[in-house]
Amino acid sequence: MKNGSISPVVLIILDGWGYREEKYGNAIAVGKTPNIDSLWQAYPRTLIQASGKAVGLPEGQMGNSEVGHLNIGAGRVVPQELVRISDAIEDGLIVQNQAIKKICQDVIERNSKLHLVGLCSSGGVHSHVNHLLGLLDVAKAKGISDVCVHAITDGRDTNPKSGLHVLKQIEYHTNQIGIGRIATVSGRYYAMDRDKRWDRIQKAYEVMTQDGYGTGCSASDLLQKSYAEGITDEFVLPVRVAPGAVEPGDGVIFFNFRPDRARQLTQAFVAPDFNGFERQTIQPLTFLTFTQYDSSFPVLVAFEPQNFNNILGQVISQHGLRQFRTAETEKYAHVTYFFNGGLEQPFEGEDRELVQSPMVSHYDEAPEMSAEDLTEVAIAAVKKQIYSLIVINYANPDMVGHTGAMDAAVNAVQTVDHCLGKLLQGISKVGGTAIIIADHGNAEYMWDEDGNPWTAHTTNLVPFILIEGEVSKIPGHGTKVPLRENGCLADIAPTILEILNLPQPAEMTGKSIIKKAEYELKPNRTPVRVGL
């Protein structure tokens, strides 16, 4: 080992790799994963919580990548936007929200339309249908009569055909309160792209902004026709159902609370220098987003970002250490923006590298995704021996798991397992420490009890494996490190700080998963286990 070189702690996040013993519909159990299997047997390991209250969500609510990475990076249980917004609606406080009051006032003064745009879903990952129903109630209370709902159907974080029930729920509510109509319907495949596939966004945008009489049938009838044609919720082609285009003078509320898949459509509406596709600027237009999608967007924000101090990346930086983050396109925001508590800018000493995801319609067409290239990027960072912390996310189990294609998901997990072996060899050569975790479950549950494809996340526990190595071999002293049970994602950052022998700040309320142990600190800040 070179003098002054660093043996890093490498946090390996297997996105969507939940734990479930039953093999039925379990791509992880069915797949051949010799590396993860041998690591699970040979090294300190435990299962940790990644859903519900353990990550700041309601009890029983499945976790997701945004929530998972927020908790991992913050080192504390982070109250999630789903809970914040639901509480504001249930308590009636949303009526007093200054941004909500402002947009309602503008619509009333201009005698214009209010448009409610968002994912109509009970999944609670990007949005919740109850928030839309709450906004409809607010509009009625404010005396706004012309309200258009631009429904984005899910089928990815929920059952592929659950949208029918949700749209009927919305139709019932609008009939009950006497205002509102579903004006357009778009599958999230189009309206919520996040990979700059602007042709998809364009289809949704144009349907929302070009007026017409619509199909002449209800939104729920339209969805039933789509099902009959073999098109499920996620892939519904954007279509106008009833009159009500977004026009100058109108107000728009985008009620998704998760930013990553709401940014591109928002850009199309509000970015002055937008060049994704040709479109006419709609002015004046009061545009409100439930949360901050991007600090540069000229919009109202109903629920401002929570500020987190002394998160993992910040602590690493404050101690003069360098760190590296890498993921492919689909998960890049998670290891950067979300991992850093919603901050776009990297900390001092934080390097990043994006690996392009394959440009395919569905990831079951390319289940390997860009895992091999990503692994090479991570190995190169390890070899430099300048980083104390390296964070890498493998997207395959989650992204392919969302397709509901079992064979492709098996291929995906096998690809990740193969790459994991290569990465661990690189880590072992520099005496590094690897921590393997997942942010939530997915690929371990591909079929429901009736054999139908399951495309959503799960509430299952996720793995935690600690691998400490010497210069020439992986085993080292890692097999003797005792781990505690009942941990959660908030405990990952304190664990990393303990390994790096850095003090845990008071704001970090998580607890190291490593039980009390004595360490001898190497000059390169990687500890070696010396005794219990």
From Swiss-Prot:
KW Repeat (keyword) present: no
GO BP term, pick one: glucose catabolic process
Gene3D superfamilies, A to Z: Alkaline Phosphatase, subunit A, BPG-independent phosphoglycerate mutase, domain B
Pathway: Carbohydrate degradation; glycolysis; pyruvate from D-glyceraldehyde 3-phosphate: step 3/5
Swiss-Prot/TrEMBL cofactor(s): Mn(2+)
Keyword Manganese: yes
Binding site for Mn(2+) 2: D15, S65, D439, H440
Family recorded in the similarity comment: Belongs to the BPG-independent phosphoglycerate mutase family.
PANTHER family: 2,3-BISPHOSPHOGLYCERATE-INDEPENDENT PHOSPHOGLYCERATE MUTASE
Protein name per its UniProtKB record: 2,3-bisphosphoglycerate-independent phosphoglycerate mutase
Organism expressing this protein natively: Trichodesmium erythraeum (strain IMS101)
